[in-house]
Design a protein with these regions (language model features):
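A short, internal acetyl-CoA/4′-phosphopantetheine-binding micro-motif in the GNAT/acyltransferase core
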Residues: 69-82, 102-103
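Conserved GNAT acetyl-CoA-binding A-motif
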Residues: 93-106
Length: 140
């Protein structure tokens, strides 16, 4: 597996590219932000979140809000290669409880989270993008 490291400000563009590509390829996801806007959003969150990346160049990243034990984002250029699991396991190794919200239409992500030990807790809460979401939890 590739090495995991904490992201720095110069990684924001690569992380934004991964999200932007996913949005472009996902028919149900509204395209609300340009690549430059996504980069700025990630940069703005860096001081308040732990952002972890895999690869050089970066091919997966996870944004973690430690005070809330919340995974705020998990994106991979090539899902199914084990990089999401690697990032989740990294966060699990330092936590006894995790939570996250996932778009209700993202059934592939739901299957992944359930394989990783997460269970569903809440359904159909509207996210900031107007799409219903499901909250998942994991406990050690």
């Amino acid at each position: 597996m590739a090495n995991i490291r904490k992201a720095n400000i110069s990684d924001a563009y690569s992380c934004a590219e991964i999200v932007h590509s996913w949005v472009q390829a996902t028919s149900w996801m509204p395209n609300r932000f340009t690549l430059a806007e996504l980069e700025s959003l990630i940069e703005e969150r860096m001081p308040n979140r732990e952002i972890w990346v895999v690869g050089d160049p970066i091919f997966a990243y996870l944004s973690f809000d430690r005070p809330n034990n919340s995974i705020a984002a998990l994106y991979s250029k090539n899902p199914g290669q084990g990089h999401g699991r690697q990032l989740i396991n990294h966060i699990k190794s330092h936590s006894s409880f995790l939570q996250l919200w996932s778009h209700s239409f993202n059934s592939k992500a739901h299957k992944f989270y359930m394989r990783e030990g997460f269970v569903t807790k809440e359904f159909n809460q509207l996210g900031a993008d107007g799409i219903p979401e499901i909250r998942f939890e994991w406990k050690r």
